[in-house]
């Protein structure tokens, strides 16, 4: 009789374990979340330039995930399988040996037009299931933004919440001695990269705000000691006056 009770109980445990494996997720509603071990393999390339872009993309993705506090990227030196191909399944056993719960890998290739194509995959290592597969085509200079977009896709798939890596920060940068401070409108990626100044510091600037499209910035500047509202186009660098205040 005891055996009849033990077997159903064991079956229930196995089913529960199978269910957990089928959906690898990070529950961010808990008070404390242990970072998920994840392997971010260098993206392969079809020439030296694309291979370098692939390494750079993987490094940015790993840094983004680690900075979120929800992921623990595994050191590349521990990887058993290297140069993971998109045309074949990963060797999941190799990744389980280093306790990687998830695997990110991809490839970078140049097209005849000069554009760069970036493909990536996200795998649940223990369930041996693909979780995300996407491809992006853009100019080579946009590789960092592609890395942020991929990071967002991984974050959303693993947590169910929208990612925030493909965002920019606009702020007022101050410099100079305390009695002659220079204030300039500045912008950068959320990780501090691609920093640039948008104004020259000749006029006092305050209260920058992104437009709903995130392509323009409104801000207040004192021109000849009179407040004036400007709108600045991030892509073109052009600005125009929206209004003056007496």
What are the roles of these predicted feature ranges?
Residues 5-17:
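Bacterial N-terminal signal peptides
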Residues 24, 86-153:
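Amphipathic beta-strand/beta-sheet edge segments enriched in Tyr/Trp
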Residues 29-91, 104-110:
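Short beta-strand->alpha-helix linker/helix-N-cap micro-motif
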Residues 113-117, 178-186, 225-231:
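Structural motif
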Residues 126, 189-193, 233-237:
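Short loop/turn segments that connect beta-strands within beta-propeller blades
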Residues 143, 153, 157-160, 202-220, ...:
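Conserved beta-propeller blade repeats
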Residues 170-179, 217-224, 243:
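Beta-strand C-termini and the immediately following turn/loop, strongest in propeller blades
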């Amino acid at each position: 009789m005891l055996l009849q009770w033990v077997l159903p109980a064991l079956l229930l445990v196995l089913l529960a374990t199978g269910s957990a494996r089928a959906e690898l997720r990070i529950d961010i509603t808990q008070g404390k979340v242990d970072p998920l071990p994840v392997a971010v393999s260098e993206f392969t390339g079809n020439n030296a330039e694309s291979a370098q872009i692939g390494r750079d993309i993987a490094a940015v993705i790993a840094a983004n995930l680690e900075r979120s506090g929800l992921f623990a990227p595994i050191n590349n030196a521990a990887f058993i399988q290297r140069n993971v191909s998109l045309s074949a399944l990963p060797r999941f056993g190799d990744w389980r040996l280093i306790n990687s719960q998830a695997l990110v890998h991809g490839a970078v290739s140049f097209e005849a037009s000069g554009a760069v194509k970036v493909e990536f995959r996200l795998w649940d290592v223990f369930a041996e299931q693909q979780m995300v597969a996407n491809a992006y085509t853009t100019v080579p200079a946009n590789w960092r933004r592609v890395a942020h977009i991929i990071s967002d896709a991984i974050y959303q798939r693993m947590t169910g919440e929208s990612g925030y890596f493909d965002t920019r920060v606009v702020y007022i940068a101050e410099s100079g001695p305390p009695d002659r401070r220079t204030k300039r409108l500045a912008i950068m990626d959320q990780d501090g990269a691609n920093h640039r100044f948008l104004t020259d510091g000749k006029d006092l600037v305050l209260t920058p705000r992104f437009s709903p499209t995130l392509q323009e910035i409104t801000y207040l500047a004192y021109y000849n000691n009179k407040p004036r509202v400007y709108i600045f186009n991030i892509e073109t660098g052009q600005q125009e006056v929206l209004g003056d205040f007496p």
